[in-house]
Structures are given as structure tokens and as C-alpha cells.
């Protein structure tokens, strides 16, 4: 009778075991066994309910997490335990057997505390809930009545039960509630989150909870939308709003730990400010501390935005992710102050500083800008920032410009930019000076004279830049990136006059970085030139293209280096360079800056150091410039820097275990002789504990009455379990804690095993912390050598760019440009030049052109000593006419692009090219309005033209395309003529002037430059040739005109049966095209024939009317000239007018 009497006790325990936390302490188990009393008599219903349960939950098969085949093998004999261990071990992550012993096992019951985080009061509440639960299930109809509960209460309760294990279960909902009464309270962990969230309301928080990262409230809804993950409903607001009074949990969403970098990057790329809240104490150390019953301590450890996100997995904008050109990755700080009155013609003083955290580049500038904000636009288009930090208030014009350029995901930067604003006090200048001084003075205390020089350099910055620098230091301190400003070697002024000025309008008109169709890189000048092998080389090439050189010596050095690489193609020394660059898979520039910030991973550090070591070994024998095999100073100086980094790189690699670093194994990362004392101490501690555990097997065997030491087994990740057959349970001491079991065996931990496991866990967690600290110290040591390493990478990027330009130079038809001395008058000559982009895109190639502007001095050396223009008489400017779609704009773009190519040091697609250096390229092309500024098409035209007239110098190249098209014919013609005359006579720069106002030829003929013997023609009239074919019912031989000037059209006797077809020859010829043939373009655009017939008739009538007026005017002038009258000067003027009218006729 003794056996059946124990059954009710076991049945009752089976119910309570599901709701009472399992205690593994042997002392508690001992006290519980000692205080056992006979169970009270149970009712029949209770017995019937309990009789349907298994006799003991610890022996239920469902508690064993090992696969069924493993269980089956274990039950067959002692060898089954070994099979079970193999099955479990196969599920673990691969790591070396040598270091696996140091990794903390995350699935033991001793870490349940990390997943539960309940205080004593919550435990008592759970016990009360258990008592009520057993009471309600004490009759057969309990489940039926449970299902009849209010559906809303059941749904809310269901949401709570599906929460994580680290949160307490809410009390059951009652059907009768007072309106507006709270249904429960937040968990301690949620209260902890709420406290952090209220301090960072503008930040989307990702919270570490156990072995997941979770989002709460509105953050969860945002994460669910952006990351396509599930959001469990609950509270979305962070205040006690009555509308959510019936909810007792925050809405939540979760992601796995290993996916944090991926999801954080996606949220940052979407424009959010993301914060990561981590647990800063571990389970084993917490258990040994005083706050074992309190929630884990959590703090905001990382904050990321679009401009500050740096991680080990690469850039935010991966190649091919967007259709537009990616942004430059810069964080730009901007402030402005009014220069004069804030009126319609407002001017502002602007200060900017742009930081690229991923590479360490810093750009600053201070300038005055007019009401059109052209200067700001130019810098924004060059820098392409992904994030703005605005200090103080901006004027409406500046604010609208920033919104226009960055406010959508399809803007010219390629993606939506994030904007953050900070206030600007009246004493901001003094505060900024003090802040920057304190920042750099702190660096100077513990360093050498270099820090003092660094401080002096920074304090010389303009006031507006100083304000931006102070704001940026404060801003980046929040993200842990303020150390970037230690590297003042990489401070660059945007407006240094060592480079050609290319404003934003020119960048867009010439399609330098992206095409004008879909804003992608294909079809741009960068696309045509980019033959680089590395990412850092590609970034440098982009800078070269955007900032052509004005220093002729540097330019000659760069061209000579490209020429030498071209002449030595397929030689061993050039192939060695190419193969070395091709072998570089890592982005060394970004890897170095991540090392500097301490954000580099172990595999990335190994890859970076090994790559640098391989590069330095390639040129280890280079001791002098002669050893490089090249004569170019640019090539030799770049190669000479590579072997200099070999000692420091080799010294760091000698400390690292390459195999462990490749597997990201922190415990074996350092070779044993280079391990710190803390690492060695904790490894010895773990070994000692494991030795004690091994010796304890004999003691456990004695307790069980066995002579042979027991064997430990590992089941479901729980180590050091002692298996005892259920037939021998009588021998098990009462102090042993049962962990799990099956039908045939039970598994226990002895008090000694529990104590030793806890001690080992403390050693393991301390070891992990010591390994991380040692790795951080190594990164700090390498960061101290950042500048020589960065110089080596800069040399590699220079070599990559030069090789890219030499690859382009090897294309058919490319030639080396010739630069005339600075003392030479402005001059440009191109023989058989081609468009550098269009020739790659057009299936039939590009028809070359020959042109000259300016005057070639007799003393200048040139491969083309007598360059000729189409007319044989080069002038300062060209007036270009021709039919629509005849190639006028393409020709002017090609000329500007060839000048830009020559001044970045590239060969050019032409037979020959001679030029003086241009300090700027200005363009005014196309017709567009500017709605966000309230500017019409013509307003945009004249505003851009006015900016050009103010900034152009005699050394500039100006391209004006169809100026005056946005207004009436008379006004447009008058403005175009006045601008043409002003540029030629007053500015005196090289200019290409495209127009459909044929009568401007008369203005052009009267413009001259120079005095006396130096006097020469100011404007040359040229046109794009075409062939005109008139088809009639009976075709005659005179219906074809090939000269292209249109003068054969007037006397052809056009009638309604006549059709005219135009064939574009795309060739430059002297003279003026007196017709634009717009109807031909309309025919190509498939305008309805009836519309074309009416348009042709109207065009003919207008031409006849204008012709009649000109004849009448000419007759009047003839009479005035023949019969005299008036002053002698009037006679000469009338004669000139008569000549002009006759030419037009």
C-alpha cells in the first residue's frame, strides 16, 4: 500500500512544477525534503483530474531536448550517454577544441535568471496565481468555463503569455472591471526601458533582452514596418494615455542577436537615429553580486545615424543598391549669418565643415553667398552629404535649397538625407572657441609638440568654421567619433585655389558624377574614367575629377606618371602593380578608420594587417627611388612609402594567432607568449576548476556506492550531469539537485558540481572581458600608428588612380595634352576631338571636331604650331548656330569635358590638344524653372548668367547655350547680344556661345579685342553642317544643298507640295546657319501632319514678311548712304547696317 499512497503527491507536484520556478540549490532541496508532510485528502474530482497526468514530470520524454534517436540509444546502455553528447555537440557552432572550454554555455539552468528578471514580489504573485489556477482546475468543467471567458480578455492575456521568459506573467483578467481601471503594471525591465526612452525620445532603441534584441512601443511599430518583422500588439505610447489603459504591455518586436548589424544598418539607412541598449553585466557575475534579484543593468552604449554609422560589415550604400548615385557619406555642419539686410537681395556669410567618418576626411570653408545660393549649392553637390547638422536658424532661401536637394529619396544625392538642428546662442562664437581649445588642449597635455602645432592650426580657422567645428565635436561625442578631429592633417579647405572651380550647375550640365536622365553613374564622366581596382582608389578618382588641378607642376607630374605607365604597359613592373591592387579585396581606408575608432573585428584586423604586410613585402627591397624601376617622381614617392610600414605591421601580426583570428575566436586570438596576465590567470582558473570537477567523479561514485568514478554527460547543453538509473534512486543523496530525466534514468548535479560550475562561469566571463580588453588595447596601439598606415593607403589609392588613367589613355585615339605656360594668353586648340562619354555610348562612334579659341603665341611650343579654327581665324569666342538636334550642345559639352580631362592629368580623346590652364568652367545650359524658389525659366537663365558674369576671369572657360530662350524674341535677342559683347570686351575669357538668333552674327562681326598690331577678331561665327533635301513630285538636281548655311532655301520657290528633309552631318563649319529647321525636329517627333502643314505655311509667311521688311530697310539705308545727310559718323554707321542687312538677305 505504500506505493499507491505516494502517487497523489507526485501528481500534485506535476501540476505545480509547470508554474513554480525550479530551484537547483541543494540546500533548498534538502530543507524541502526534510519538511515534507503527508498530503491532505483530495476530492474525487481532484483525483480524477490528477489521474490523467503522467506520474512524474521529470521522467516525461518531452522534457528531453535531445533528438529521439539519441534518447533511444541512451536507454540501451552506458554507451548511450556518449552518443548523446555527440548529438548535442553536432549542434554547436564550430570552434577549436582548445578554446571551446573557455566559451560560456548559454543554455544552462544557472542562467535562467537572465531570462526571468523577477523580484521577490513578482515571485509571490506567481505563487498566488498558481494557487488560483489549481483551484479553478479542480473540477471536470474547468476547461469548458475557461473557454467561455470574455474573448477580449483572453486575447490580451494570450499576448502576455507569449512574451519572453524574462518577463513576469500578468494576473488573469477578470470579466468585471471598472471602466478606466489599470489591468496590470509594466515589468521591471519595461520600466527600465521606459526610463532610458524618456531621455532619448528622438532615438529608436534596440534593447538587449537575454539572447534577443527587442523593440518596444512605437519603436516596435517602426521596426516592423521597416524590417518586415512581426509586431506583437500592446502599448505604443510612452505616456499613460487613457486610450491605452486597458493594455498592460508594450507592443514589441524582436530580432536575433547575430542579425543586429544588418537590421541596425537598414534602420539607419532609412533615416532613423538608432540607439543600442545593452546589458552591461553578465548572468554569472550578476548571480554572484548583490543585485541578483534586480533586473540586469542596461545602458545606451551605441548611437548611430546615417552620417556616423561605422561597422565591420561595410558601408551603408552598397554598390548596386540604388539606381541613383550614392551619397559621399559626409556629415555636413552648416551655419550662416546675414551679411547685409534680410531683403530680397539678401547675402549671407556661411561656414561649413564636412566630415566623412568612414575615411577620416574633413572639408571646411567660409564664404559669402548671394540670394541665389549658388555657392552653397556648389559645395553641397560636390560633397553630397548624407546628413546635415544645422547650427541656428537658416534663411528661407538656404532652408529651401537644402530641402530641395535632400528632401526625397530620389534627390541628386541618390538618397534621402537626414537633417538635425541645434540651437545657436548669441555667444556661440566665444563658447565655440573655448570648447575647441579645451578639446585640443587636452590632447596636448599627454603628447608632443605635434599636438601644439595641431592646436595652432585649428585656432586659425575662420569664426564660422570654428562654430561648426565646436558643434560637430559635441555632436560626434555622442557617437564616440570625436577622435576624428585629432587627424588635422586631413583638414582640407574647399576653396583653396589649387584646383579649378566647378560649380553645381556645371557638374550637372556636364554630367560629371551622374547622368541627367536617371541620375545614375552610367553615362557620366566618372563612369567613363573609372577603371580602378579598389574602393579607396575609386573615391580618390572621384575627388580628382571634381577638383582639376591649377598647379601646372603637379599637373605635369601626374600626366608624366600616366604616360610612363602607358609606355610600360604589359611590363613586369606595371603588371606587378596591377596584380597587387587586384589582390586587395578589403577597403583598407575604411578598415583603418574603424581600427582608429576601435570598431574593427578580429577577422577584419587580421585581413587588414596581412594585406598591408603583403604589400610592404612586395617592395621590401626598395631602398631608393632607383629601385622602384620608374622615373616619375609621383610613382617613386608613392612606392617608397609602402615598405616603410613593414616593421610595425609585422610586429602586430607576430602577436596574433591567425587561425583563431580568422574564426573570430577571442580566447585564442593572441599567441600564448603575448597573452595578458588577466587572460592567463583566468585560463588557469578554468583549468583548475575543471581538474576539481574531474576529481569529484570519485567522490560522487562513493556517494552512490560505486567503486568506479562516475562519468559526466551533457544533455541539451547542460554540462556535468550525473546519470543515475531510476532503479538506483534510493542511493542518491538528498542534497543532489535533479535537473532532468527520462523513463529509465535521472540526471543530477551535486552541490560540489554546482559550486564549481558557478566558479568556472565567473572565470569564463572574466576571461571574455579580459580578452576584449586586450583586443581593445591592441587596436589602440595600432591607432597610434594611424598616420603612416594611412599614408601608405593613400599611396596605393594614388597608384590605383594613375593606373586607371593609363588604362583610359591606352584606348584608341587618345593623346597627351600640351600645357602652355601661365604667361601665355588664354588659348585652347583641339584637333579631331571627341566627346569622352558619348563615344562609349553611341553605336557608330562620335564624329570628331576641330576648333581653336584665343591666340597662340609665337614662342609657345605646341605639337600643332599653326592650329586652325573652322574659319582659319581663331578668336576669343565662338558664336555657334545650326539646326535643332544638329549637335551644338554636344560639341560645347565635349570641349568643356576635354578641358576638364586635361586638367585632372588624363589623356584626351583627340589627335592633339594644346591649352592654357583654366581656373573655372562655367556653363548655362538647358531650360528649367525652379518652383521651390518661385523662379521662372527665364529668371533661372538670367540668374545663372549673372553669377557667371560676376565670377568669370580672363582664365575661365564659359559655355552659354541658347541664352534668352525663356522670354520674347526681341528681349531674348537683346540680352544675348549684350552678354556676348560684355564677355568678349570686358571679361576677355574663352567662350562658346550657342544661339538661334542668327542676327547676332552682325554683333559678332563688330567685336574686336586688343589694340594696334595685337588687334584681332573677338568672335568667330561657326555652325553645325547639315544637308537639306527638297523633295517634289518631280525631283530636280537643284533640290539638294550641302553647304548647310541655309542660303539656298529662299529662292527655291517652296510650294505646298514640297517637303524638306534635313540630314545632320555633325561637323563644324564656318559661317552662320540662317535657319533652325525646327519643323524638321517636329516631324521627327511625329507631330500630326495637318499641324505640320499649318506650321510650314505660317513659317513661310513670317519669313516673307521679315524679308520684305529687311528689303525695305535696306532700300532706306541705300538712299541715306547715296544721298548723304547727317554727320560723317552716321554715314559709316548706316553703311555697316546696310552690309549686315545684305548678309542676312
UniProtKB/Swiss-Prot annotation:
A GO molecular-function annotation: mismatched DNA binding
SUPFAM superfamilies, per database record: DNA repair protein MutS, domain I, DNA repair protein MutS, domain III, P-loop containing nucleoside triphosphate hydrolases
Chain intervals for the UniProt region annotation (Mispair-binding domain): 183-307
Subcellular location: Nucleus
One GO cellular component term: nucleus
Single GO BP term: mismatch repair
Residues reported in the UniProt entry to bind ATP: 882-889
Record region (Disordered): 1-183, 857-879, 1030-1056
Compositionally biased spans, kind Polar residues: 13-33
Biased composition (Acidic residues): 158-169, 1036-1048
One Pfam family from the record: MutS_V
Keywords: ATP-binding, DNA damage, DNA repair, DNA-binding, Nucleotide-binding, Nucleus
Basic and acidic residues: compositionally biased ranges: 121-131
Record-stated family: Belongs to the DNA mismatch repair MutS family. MSH3 subfamily.
Function field: Component of the post-replicative DNA mismatch repair system (MMR). Heterodimerizes with msh-2 to form MutS beta, which binds to DNA mismatches thereby initiating DNA repair. Msh-3 provides substrate-binding and substrate specificity to the complex. When bound, the MutS beta heterodimer bends the DNA helix and shields approximately 20 base pairs. Acts mainly to repair insertion-deletion loops (IDLs) from 2 to 13 nucleotides in size, but can also repair base-base and single insertion-deletion mismatches that occur during replication.
Subunit organization: Heterodimer consisting of msh-2-msh-3 (MutS beta). Forms a ternary complex with MutL alpha (mlh-1-pms-1).
Protein name: DNA mismatch repair protein msh-3
Amino acid at each position: 500500500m505504500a506505493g499507491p499512497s505516494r502517487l497523489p503527491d507526485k501528481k500534485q507536484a506535476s501540476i505545480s512544477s509547470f508554474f513554480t520556478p525550479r530551484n537547483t540549490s541543494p540546500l533548498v532541496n534538502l530543507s524541502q525534503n526534510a519538511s515534507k508532510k503527508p498530503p491532505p485528502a483530495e476530492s474525487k474530482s481532484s483525483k480524477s483530474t490528477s489521474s490523467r497526468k503522467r506520474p512524474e514530470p521529470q521522467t516525461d520524454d518531452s522534457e528531453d531536448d535531445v533528438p529521439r534517436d539519441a534518447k533511444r540509444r541512451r536507454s540501451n546502455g552506458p554507451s548511450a550517454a556518449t552518443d548523446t553528447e555527440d548529438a548535442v555537440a553536432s549542434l554547436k557552432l564550430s570552434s577549436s577544441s582548445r578554446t571551446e572550454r573557455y566559451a560560456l554555455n548559454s543554455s544552462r539552468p544557472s542562467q535562467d535568471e537572465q531570462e526571468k528578471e523577477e523580484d521577490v514580489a513578482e515571485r509571490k504573485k506567481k505563487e498566488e496565481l498558481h494557487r488560483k489556477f489549481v483551484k479553478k482546475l479542480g473540477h471536470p468543467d474547468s476547461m469548458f468555463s475557461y473557454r467561455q471567458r470574455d474573448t477580449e480578455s483572453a486575447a490580451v492575456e494570450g499576448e502576455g503569455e507569449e512574451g519572453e521568459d524574462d518577463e513576469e506573467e500578468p494576473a488573469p483578467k477578470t470579466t468585471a472591471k471598472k471602466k478606466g481601471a489599470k489591468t496590470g503594471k509594466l515589468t521591471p525591465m519595461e520600466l527600465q526601458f521606459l526610463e532610458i526612452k524618456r531621455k532619448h525620445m528622438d532615438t529608436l532603441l534596440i534593447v538587449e533582452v537575454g539572447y534577443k534584441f527587442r523593440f518596444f512601443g512605437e519603436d516596435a511599430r517602426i521596426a516592423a514596418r521597416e524590417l518586415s518583422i512581426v509586431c506583437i500588439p500592446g502599448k505604443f505610447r510612452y505616456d499613460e494615455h487613457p486610450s491605452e489603459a486597458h493594455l498592460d504591455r508594450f507592443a514589441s518586436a524582436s530580432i536575433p542577436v547575430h542579425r543586429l548589424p544588418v537590421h541596425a544598418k537598414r534602420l539607419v539607412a532609412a533615416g532613423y537615429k538608432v540607439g543600442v541598449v545593452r546589458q552591461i553585466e553578465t548572468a554569472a557575475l550578476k548571480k554572484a553580486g548583490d543585485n541578483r534579484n534586480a533586473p540586469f543593468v542596461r545602458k545606451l552604449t551605441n548611437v548611430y545615424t546615417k552620417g556616423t554609422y561605422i561597422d565591420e560589415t561595410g558601408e551603408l550604400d552598397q554598390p548596386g543598391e540604388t539606381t541613383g548615385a550614392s551619397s559621399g557619406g559626409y556629415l555636413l555642419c552648416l551655419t550662416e549669418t546675414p551679411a547685409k539686410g534680410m531683403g530680397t537681395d539678401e547675402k549671407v556669410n556661411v561656414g561649413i565643415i564636412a566630415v566623412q567618418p568612414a575615411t577620416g576626411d574633413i572639408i571646411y570653408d567660409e564664404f559669402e553667398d548671394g540670394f541665389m545660393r549658388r555657392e552653397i549649392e556648389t559645395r553641397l553637390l560636390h560633397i553630397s552629404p548624407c546628413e546635415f547638422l544645422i547650427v541656428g536658424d537658416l534663411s528661407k532661401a538656404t532652408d529651401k535649397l537644402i530641402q530641395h536637394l535632400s528632401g526625397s529619396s530620389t534627390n541628386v544625392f541618390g538618397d534621402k538625407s537626414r537633417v538635425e538642428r541645434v540651437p545657436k546662442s548669441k555667444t556661440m562664437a566665444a563658447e565655440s572657441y573655448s570648447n575647441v581649445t579645451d578639446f585640443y588642449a587636452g590632447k596636448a597635455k599627454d603628447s608632443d609638440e605635434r599636438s601644439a602645432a595641431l592646436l595652432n592650426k585649428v585656432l586659425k580657422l575662420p569664426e564660422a568654421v570654428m562654430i561648426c567645428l565646436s558643434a560637430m565635436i559635441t555632436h560626434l561625442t555622442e557617437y564616440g567619433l570625436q577622435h576624428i578631429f585629432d587627424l588635422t592633417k586631413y583638414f582640407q579647405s574647399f576653396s583653396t585655389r589649387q584646383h579649378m572651380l566647378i560649380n553645381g550647375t556645371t557638374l550637372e550640365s556636364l554630367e560629371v558624377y551622374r547622368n541627367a536622365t536617371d541620375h545614375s553613374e552610367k553615362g557620366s564622366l566618372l563612369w567613363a574614367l573609372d577603371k580602378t581596382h579598389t574602393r579607396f582608389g575609386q573615391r580618390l578618382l572621384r575627388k580628382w575629377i571634381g577638383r582639376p588641378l591649377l598647379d601646372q607642376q603637379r599637373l605635369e607630374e601626374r600626366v608624366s606618371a600616366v604616360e610612363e605607365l602607358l609606355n610600360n604597359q604589359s611590363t613586369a613592373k606595371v603588371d606587378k602593380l596591377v596584380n597587387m591592387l587586384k589582390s586587395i579585396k578589403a577597403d583598407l581606408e575604411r578598415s583603418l578608420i574603424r581600427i582608429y575608432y576601435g570598431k574593427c573585428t578580429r577577422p577584419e584586423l587580421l585581413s587588414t594587417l596581412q594585406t598591408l604586410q603583403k604589400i610592404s613585402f612586395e617592395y621590401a627591397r626598395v631602398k631608393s627611388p632607383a629601385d622602384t624601376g620608374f622615373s616619375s617622381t609621383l610613382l617613386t614617392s608613392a612606392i617608397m612609402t609602402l615598405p616603410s610600414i613593414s616593421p610595425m605591421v609585422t610586429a602586430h601580426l607576430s602577436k596574433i594567432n591567425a587561425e583563431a583570428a580568422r574564426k573570430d575566436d577571442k580566447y585564442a586570438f593572441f599567441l600564448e607568449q603575448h597573452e595578458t596576465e588577466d587572460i592567463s590567470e583566468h585560463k588557469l582558473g578554468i583549468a583548475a576548476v575543471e581538474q576539481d570537477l574531474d576529481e569529484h567523479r570519485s567522490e560522487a561514485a562513493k556517494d552512490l556506492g560505486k567503486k568506479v568514478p562516475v562519468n559526466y554527460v551533457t544533455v541539451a547543453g547542460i554540462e556535468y550531469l550525473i546519470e543515475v538509473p531510476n532503479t538506483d534512486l534510493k542511493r542518491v543523496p538528498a542534497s543532489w539537485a535533479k535537473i532532468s530525466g527520462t523513463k529509465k534514468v535521472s540526471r543530477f548535479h551535486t552541490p560540489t558540481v554546482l559550486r564549481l560550475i558557478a566558479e568556472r562561469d565567473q572565470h569564463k566571463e572574466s576571461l571574455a572581458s579580459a580578452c576584449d580588453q586586450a583586443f581593445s588595447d591592441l587596436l589602440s596601439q595600432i591607432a597610434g600608428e594611424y598616420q603612416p598606415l594611412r599614408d601608405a593607403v593613400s599611396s596605393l589609392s594614388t597608384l590605383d588612380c594613375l593606373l586607371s588613367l593609363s588604362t583610359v589613355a591606352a584606348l584608341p585615339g587618345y593623346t597627351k595634352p600640351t600645357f602652355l605656360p601661365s604667361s601665355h594668353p588664354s588659348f585652347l586648340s583641339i584637333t579631331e576631338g571627341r566627346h569622352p562619354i558619348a563615344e562609349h555610348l553611341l553605336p557608330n562612334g562620335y564624329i570628331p571636331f576641330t576648333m581653336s579659341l584665343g591666340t597662340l603665341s609665337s614662342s609657345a611650343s605646341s605639337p600643332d604650331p599653326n592650329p586652325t579654327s573652322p574659319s582659319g581665324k581663331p578668336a576669343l569666342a565662338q558664336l555657334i548656330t545650326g539646326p535643332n538636334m544638329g549637335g551644338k550642345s554636344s560639341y560645347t559639352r565635349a570641349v568643356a569635358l576635354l578641358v576638364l580631362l586635361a586638367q585632372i592629368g588624363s589623356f584626351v580623346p583627340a589627335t592633339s590638344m594644346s591649352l592654357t590652364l583654366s581656373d573655372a568652367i562655367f556653363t548655362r545650359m538647358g531650360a528649367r524653372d525652379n518652383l521651390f524658389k518661385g523662379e521662372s525659366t527665364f529668371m533661372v537663365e538670367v540668374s545663372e548668367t549673372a553669377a557667371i558674369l560676376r565670377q568669370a576671369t580672363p582664365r575661365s572657360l564659359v559655355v552659354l547655350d541658347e541664352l534668352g530662350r525663356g522670354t520674347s524674341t526681341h528681349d531674348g535677342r537683346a540680352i544675348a547680344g549684350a552678354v556676348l559683347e560684355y564677355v568678349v570686351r570686358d571679361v576677355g575669357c574663352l567662350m562658346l556661345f550657342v544661339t538661334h538668333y542668327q542676327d547676332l552674327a552682325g554683333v559678332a562681326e563688330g567685336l574686336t579685342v586688343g589694340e594696334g598690331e595685337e588687334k584681332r577678331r573677338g568672335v568667330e561665327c561657326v555652325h553645325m553642317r547639315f544637308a537639306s533635301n527638297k523633295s517634289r513630285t518631280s525631283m530636280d538636281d537643284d533640290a539638294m544643298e550641302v553647304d548647310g548655311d541655309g542660303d539656298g532655301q529662299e529662292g527655291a520657290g517652296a510650294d505646298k507640295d514640297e517637303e524638306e528633309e534635313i540630314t545632320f552631318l555633325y561637323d563644324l563649319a564656318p559661317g552662320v546657319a540662317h535657319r533652325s529647321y525646327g519643323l524638321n525636329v517636329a516631324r521627327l517627333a511625329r507631330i500630326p501632319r495637318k499641324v505640320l502643314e499649318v506650321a510650314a505655311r505660317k513659317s513661310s509667311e513670317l519669313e516673307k514678311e521679315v524679308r520684305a521688311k529687311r528689303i525695305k530697310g535696306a532700300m532706306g539705308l541705300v538712299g541715306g548712304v547715296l544721298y548723304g545727310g547727317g554727320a560723317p559718323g552716321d554715314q559709316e554707321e548706316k553703311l555697316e547696317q546696310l552690309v549686315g542687312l545684305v548678309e542676312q538677305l
